[in-house]
A protein has these predicted regions:
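Generic recognition of short, well-ordered alpha-helical interface segments
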Residues: 15, 19, 42, 46, ...
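Short, contiguous alpha-helical
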Residues: 30-78, 82, 129-159
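A charged, amphipathic interaction segment
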Residues: 96-151
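Short, helix-capping/interhelical loops that line the mouth of catalytic, cofactor-
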Residues: 2-7, 57-108
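Extreme N-terminal tail/first-helix region
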Residues: 1-23
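Non-transmembrane alpha-helical segments in soluble domains
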Residues: 21-24, 44, 48-52, 112-119, ...
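Short alpha-helical hairpin
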Residues: 17-22, 87, 123-130
Length: 159
């Protein structure tokens, strides 16, 4: 990996472990999203679900992206482009699921825990590949890029 890519991945990982949570704590729990139907706590719980795919707690065996589109979505993942507002997730229903945690604080703590489990998993298993239902088989760099884009997308949804 070249040095610039390594620096970018390290900065993205710092965002995922620290800056994201510092910024999310500043958002009022009742703030309406700029788009979409999820409230702040639902969004946090949605991110926890996505991290559990990568940390082995909720593996996803199937790739739902058609084979002929897989390279295009992977090219997006490794580009500077961001997720657009209102990006649809075919694994989610038309309405957000009910809340799982009793409070926003508990949801945030859960997400922090899931992110730490993910980081520890990849640090203790160099070269590990874990399947993502949209982007296919990803290594640590791929998951870091995906989570950076995904977390930033939802942070902008509430900023």
């Amino acid at each position: 990996m070249n040095l610039n890519l390594m620096r970018m991945t390290n900065a993205q990982k710092d965002f995922l472990l620290n800056s994201f949570f510092e910024q999310i704590m500043l958002i009022p729990s009742d703030k309406a999203p700029a788009w979409g139907k999820m409230g702040l706590q639902q969004m946090i719980e949605h991110l926890s679900d996505s991290v559990r795919m990568a940390n082995g707690k909720q593996p996803h065996a199937e790739i739902v992206t058609p084979a002929e589109r897989l390279q295009a979505v992977r090219d997006f993942l490794y580009s500077e482009r961001e997720f657009k507002p209102e990006t649809k997730n075919s694994l989610m229903g038309p309405e957000p699921p009910p809340l799982f945690n009793e409070s926003l604080d508990l949801a945030i703590a859960e997400l922090q825990h899931e992110v730490k489990v993910w980081v520890e998993l990849f640090e203790s298993n160099p070269g590990l590949i874990v399947r993502n239902p949209f982007f296919g088989d990803l290594d640590e760099d791929g998951w870091t890029r995906l989570f950076y884009k995904h977390f930033l997308h939802h942070l902008k949804q509430f900023s």
